UniProtKB/Swiss-Prot annotation:
Disruption phenotype: Leads to a complete loss of austinoid production. Transmembrane segments: none annotated. It comes from Aspergillus calidoustus. It comes from the Eukaryota. InterPro entries: Fungal_Meroterpenoid_Isomerase. Part of the gene cluster that mediates the biosynthesis of calidodehydroaustin, a fungal meroterpenoid. The first step of the pathway is the synthesis of 3,5-dimethylorsellinic acid by the polyketide synthase ausA. 3,5-dimethylorsellinic acid is then prenylated by the polyprenyl transferase ausN. Further epoxidation by the FAD-dependent monooxygenase ausM and cyclization by the probable terpene cyclase ausL lead to the formation of protoaustinoid A. May play a possible function as a regulator. This is Austinoid biosynthesis cluster protein S. In A.calidoustus, the austinoid gene cluster lies on a contiguous DNA region, while clusters from E.nidulans and P.brasilianum are split in their respective genomes. Genetic rearrangements provoked variability among the clusters and E.nidulans produces the least number of austionoid derivatives with the end products austinol and dehydroaustinol, while P.brasilianum can produce until acetoxydehydroaustin, and A.calidoustus produces the highest number of identified derivatives. Homodimer. Belongs to the trt14 isomerase family.
Length: 144
C-alpha cells in the first residue's frame, strides 16, 4: 500500500470512529499525544486525547447520532511528505433540539507510518454552529 493510500485509509478509519461517537473508538485511530484544535476564530480550542474524551462524553447528552462523511468534490489534499491530509466533511446529527448540519475542513497530521492521527485541525462553519448553540440555549432557558 502506498503512503497516499495509507493516509487516506487512516482518514476513513477516523471518520468511521467519529461516527461511532465513542471515545474508545476514537482512541484506536489516534496517537496518545494527538491534539485536536478548533481553528475557527469564534471556536478556538486545543484538546488532548483525554480532554477530547471528556468533551465527547459530555456531548453524548446532546447528540443522539452523528454522521460525518467526506465530501468528494475534489477538495481533498494529500501531502505525502508531511503526512497531512485535508478533507471537507459534511456533518449530519440528530440532537436533543432536532437536526444539526454543518460543514468543516479537517487538516489531519499523521504519524510517520501514516496509520494514526497525530493532530487534527478543525475549521467548522461557525455561522451554522452559532445557530445550533442558540437552539441549545433556547431549549435550556425554556426548561428552567
Amino acid at each position: 500500500m502506498s503512503i497516499r493510500e495509507r493516509l487516506l485509509a487512516t482518514v476513513s478509519r477516523y471518520i468511521a470512529a467519529y461516527n461511532e461517537f465513542d471515545p474508545s473508538a476514537m482512541k484506536t485511530v489516534r496517537t496518545v499525544s494527538c491534539l485536536t484544535h478548533g481553528i475557527a476564530p469564534t471556536c478556538k480550542f486545543t484538546q488532548s486525547v483525554e480532554e477530547h474524551t471528556k468533551h465527547m462524553m459530555l456531548s453524548r447528552g446532546v447528540f443522539r447520532s452523528v454522521n460525518a462523511s467526506i465530501v468528494d468534490d475534489g477538495t481533498t489534499v494529500v501531502d505525502e511528505g508531511s503526512r497531512k491530509v485535508v478533507v471537507k466533511v459534511k456533518l449530519r446529527c440528530e440532537t436533543i433540539v432536532g437536526p444539526y448540519e454543518n460543514e468543516a475542513m479537517f487538516i489531519m497530521a499523521m504519524d510517520e507510518e501514516g496509520t494514526l492521527v497525530d493532530g487534527i485541525f478543525q475549521f467548522l462553519d461557525t455561522a451554522c454552529f452559532r445557530q445550533f448553540q442558540g437552539r441549545l440555549e433556547e431549549a435550556h432557558v425554556s426548561r428552567d
